[in-house]
Amino acid sequence: PEKPQYEGIHAIVAPSASFAADDGSIALNGNSASNVARLLSHTGHSIIKGMGEMQITDAEYKEIKEFTDKLVSNNNTPTEIYQTIFRWITTNIQYQSGYVDNNPYPVFKTHQAICQGYANLLNVMLHTQDIPAMNANGMLVPVGGHAWNYVYLDDWYVSDPTNNGHFRMSELDTYTHLVPMTLDVDLFEDEEFVYHFSEERLNIRQVKKSGKQLIVPFGTNGFRVSAFNPSKPLPEGVEEIYIGQNIESLGENLLGLSIHAPNVKHAFVDSANSKLKSYGQVVYRDSQPYYIPAAATVIQFLPIHTFGKNFLKDHAHVETIVIQSGTKSLDAYAFENCPRLQKAYIPEETVVDAKAFYGVHPQFQILRGIVKN
């Protein structure tokens, strides 16, 4: 017999004019260290307005400043002050492989730290002397994860107090073992967005204001933006996100949109984007679902071999899902704690575990057949 066909469920397609156009911004296609050097050479040291997200009280800071003032009392230039502080840290702080508190004050008092503690203390001590510095986190080749600093004296320098390393930033060949992935300062800011360097990309860290439709910018200050992974909540009115051809990542380890965009119903990706694509409210990367808007009510999926456990969990708004032909199976608890989910359109040939839908609407039903868009 002919298979049932359901009509009236359409995948919304955004017009191409909705996306940010190529504004000629420069793509950061070099290695990570060269990209950071390019960005910092452009921004200058005025971007450093504090100590990042350092955990330190006013009393702790005051004590470190009083000590540092005495330590550098015979120094006259920023370079001399930096050298004295750097020498004191590399001489007096001992690397401790076990657990230690790496906030700057405990490091200052106990003289024990791992790399993060070294970088934190150098950052704070330089800050007490009005010398611009920031923390960098990334990789120490071939060892693994590492933290160090960028410092501005007469020029930008790369400072690795853990390993007694000091390099001019422009001399990239001298510190190829340091691969920066994240900086703890904002690089650019305008009326709508705040940008920083994260996960080796120029990223939009914050959306300051937007209407219902959020158009992700193509570039800023002449540099192409390649990531949109906010670390602060989007404005409440944002319901639609338009992701242009420039965006390659929404986050590697943690998608900020999954946390900070509770009211987004639709996410669209420019068809010219070679890394991401969108269909039926879902953003895909490498043919796998990557981001599902938290307020989407109808979600259509491209064919996926298997919907595994917790494929979609704790989605408060979805009411209808559509599974396409080519999907082999839905495992137990594939869709869990989706209290408004009432309908699932699933091809007849797709195997569905008896517990594939758990914690859904009391009137939930599976409709077998073909969905005509």
Describe these PLM feature segments:
Residues 1-31:
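Intrinsically disordered, low-complexity N-terminal segments that are enriched in acidic
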Residues 45-108:
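Secondary-structure boundary elements
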Residues 81-85, 89, 111-126:
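Active-site nucleophilic cysteine motif
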Residues 89, 135-140, 160-164, 219, ...:
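Active-site-proximal beta-strand/loop segments in catalytic clefts of secreted hydrolases
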Residues 117-181:
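Hydrophobic/aromatic-rich core segments of domains that either
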Residues 151-154, 207, 285-286:
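Active-site beta-strand termini and strand-to-loop segments that position acidic
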Residues 192-199, 209-226, 234-249, 257-281, ...:
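Structural signature of tandem-repeat unit edges
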